């Protein structure tokens, strides 16, 4: 008897389900179809064997990519090896994707089945999945599916920004539109300004130069010898500048008002700015083509190569086209008209704008266009699928087209393709090595800058952290200094007079010398951490009941006195003991005198 298990892939994890044991799987089809919508009936046929949830969204994305590519992920392998029976011949595993089924059968040895009753079971599992798995709600399952769908689509749409061909498509389309607009606007400026200065149209043929001159001259009656140098800069020809100056003096144009001149100058400036932008866009297109398709650019030119890519939709689509399609790309109307009327098909499309077909004789135009389309197809495939694109192959292919042209004209036999490609391979390897070396240098420089930046950030953070403890110490020292005076006020609050306090105060002022003050300051800084802790605890723990004890405490809390014989480097505890003993002697003398 065959045991049927079904593998279901969900955004939250893998689920392995088992069906009730029957001798023939086909007998399950009507029962499953009836019970798909009813959860109770579906539970009687299908039960959940194991569920393997994904640890994170990244793991879910990895598993989704593996399933789409037909690869058995480690999580799926662990689930199947753990929960499927060891006797593989008695197990039939149902899967929804034939690719993953073939991979499981090849790697793990389980018999896999798709379609038929498996599709109906998976439909029911998809409908009741949140009820089969404990702790899973319909809302959380939908959120997981939405998040995984966005991540999966983002990974599929992601592309390399350095070799994007969509920018080329938009640039060449905008360039063609700008050419039409600049031509139309220039003709409008010629017609508008021609009423005032009609002779300028015959002298200047270039549209951009004409608009610059119309903007500069303005009223022709104000043109004089002082502006001749500027005219030479604009026309880049001294004879034309002199002719413009002479024509302005004897022009047959009508006079024009100031407001009309302002409008003409404003429109001329717009046309000039459009022409300048057109030049910058053309430079941008050339740089992009050298990055994306260097071989195609070297072979047929940047403009024609960009039009081929734009017409095909992408560089990948152009690489997939055969040479016969590349030859007539852009001449679809003529092709279908010829097929409809059973006439001659076109010989060339967009590649007609290359210089090779124009240089060929009329009888050789078809032959050279076919040869050029063949080389364009090869160049586009090299650019599309090479890891480090270089222009070496495009230059060699261009040399071959030149040799073919000379062969048609003079009969000189060109070199063999095998020899040319061998030379190109050697040069391409050298160029690729040079490019990789430059990229490695740039990466090293970038890493050095990153390390310096991180080191500067770490240094700044360490300086900030080192400054904060000092501030905390300063804040903690201030209340400690205030607490030194508190024990002196205790005897006064209790109503007791201490003779040692009144007796010792004038002696302190007389007995301290400069050396003793210096030594006491040094000892206070050395023992600032240990002594204040003792002072802090004494007033809280003990109360003053005897004037003698109060005298002893007040004497011990006063500033420490050191004799000149004692060294400055003595410890803080010894200094405290000596000062307290001296104060005891003074206290006894005062009591005897009383």
Curated annotation (Swiss-Prot):
Keywords: Acetylation, Cytoplasm, Isopeptide bond, Methylation, Neurodegeneration, Nucleus, Phosphoprotein, Ribonucleoprotein, Ribosome biogenesis, Spinocerebellar ataxia, Ubl conjugation. Residues 292-410 form the Nop domain. Residues 458-469, 488-504 have a biased composition (Low complexity). GO terms for molecular function: cadherin binding; histone methyltransferase binding; RNA binding; snoRNA binding. Part of a large pre-ribosomal ribonucleoprotein (RNP) complex, that consists of at least 62 ribosomal proteins, 45 nonribosomal proteins and both pre-rRNA and mature rRNA species. Within this complex directly interacts with TCOF1 in an RNA-independent manner. Core component of box C/D small nucleolar ribonucleoprotein (snoRNP) particles; the core proteins SNU13, NOP56, NOP58 and FBL or FBLL1 assemble stepwise onto the snoRNA. Interacts with NOP1 and NOP58. Interacts with NUFIP1, RUVBL1 and RUVBL2; RUVBL1:RUVBL2 seem to bridge the association of NOP56 with NUFIP1. Belongs to the NOP5/NOP56 family. This is Nucleolar protein 56. It comes from Homo sapiens (Human). The lineage of its organism: Eukaryota, Metazoa, Chordata, Craniata, Vertebrata. The gene is NOP56.
